[in-house]
Amino acid sequence: MKTTQVICLGEALVDRLGPIGGQLDFKHSYNDFLGGAPANVACGLAKLGAKSAFIGCLGNDSIGQKFCNLFNSRGVNISALQIHESLPTRIVLVARD
């Protein structure tokens, strides 16, 4: 990470938005969005041309792979990213009024 200008350290997670109305029925209707402030900032800075890196931990699962694909497509350095073999990537359940 010698040439990195900004290192973003922290969380990468999925925001799982439930249906409008406040019902927590995530079995049938929800939308997933890749998120987490440090992950978003790393991608945003890279998109603006800065040399950014993300340091955090993802699960060895399909969501973790989506994050890796996103970081790679944006040019974010993930050489210090940790992949946890037995725990999943975090999901935050969001109830909407």
What do the PLM-derived regions correspond to, one by one?
Residues L34-V41, I63:
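Conserved donor sugar-nucleotide recognition element shared by glycan-biosynthetic enzymes
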Residues D25-G35:
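Short pre-catalytic strand/loop immediately N-terminal to key active-site residues, enriched for Gly-Thr
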Residues C8, G35-G36, I83:
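Conserved strand-loop elements at the edges of beta-sheets that form or border functional pockets
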Residues E11, G36-A37, C57-N60:
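Gly/Ser/Thr-rich helix-start
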Residues M1-Q23:
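Positively charged, low-complexity intrinsically disordered leader regions
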Residues G21-D25, C68-L70:
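Short, glycine/charged-enriched secondary-structure capping and boundary segments
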Residues D15-R16, N40-L48:
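Beta-barrel outer-membrane channel/assembly domains of diderm bacteria
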Residues K51-D97:
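Conserved N-terminal subdomain of the carbohydrate kinase-like
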